C-alpha cells in the first residue's frame, strides 16, 4: 500500500499543486516587549521588508495608578520614538509577533494579546533565550516563568537561542 506522502508526490497529484507564493505579503507588526529585545528588533528593522512594521512596548509600565486613566496609545512606539496607538496598529495587521527576552518583564503581552484577540489577529511570541556569556543557557525556571507569562496571549510560542531565527521566520512569512 502506497503512503499518503508518496501518493501526493505523484505526477497525477502534482497538477493540483500551487507553485507560486502567496500573492500578497502579510502585514506583520513586530513588537519588542522589553529593552533587551528592543535591540534585536532594531537590528531586524535594518533589513529590507515588504510589509513589516517594528515597534517597541518597553515603555509599558503596567496598570495605571489609582485615579489615572489608562491610555492604549501612550506606551507603544515606533523605532523613531513616535507614539503609536495599539488598536490602530493591530487593526492593520495580519500577524503580531511579540519578542521578549527570557527573564524580562513581558506584562505588555497581556494588553497586546487582548487587542489581537478582540480584532481576531494571529499572535506569535518569540522568547529570546541566548546563553549568558560563559554559561550553557537560560535556566529552565526562567524559561518556564516566561512561557507561563506569554502562553495566554499568543497562539504560537517559540523559544530561540539565536536572533537570526526571527529574521528567518519573518522572511518565511513574506513580511
Residue ranges of each PLM-predicted region?
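Short N-terminal or domain-adjacent regulatory/targeting segments
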Residues: 1-26, 80
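Amphipathic helical hotspot of TIR/SEFIR-family domains
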Residues: 106-119
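A short, aliphatic-rich alpha-helical micro-motif
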Residues: 87-91, 150-151
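Structural recognition of alpha->loop->beta junctions
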Residues: 134-175
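Short beta-alpha junction loops
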Residues: 121-141
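Structural motif
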Residues: 30-35, 100-102, 128-129, 162
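Short, glycine-rich nucleotide/cofactor-binding loops
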Residues: 95-106
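Glycine-rich, small/polar surface segments that engage phosphate groups of diverse ligands
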Residues: 20-79
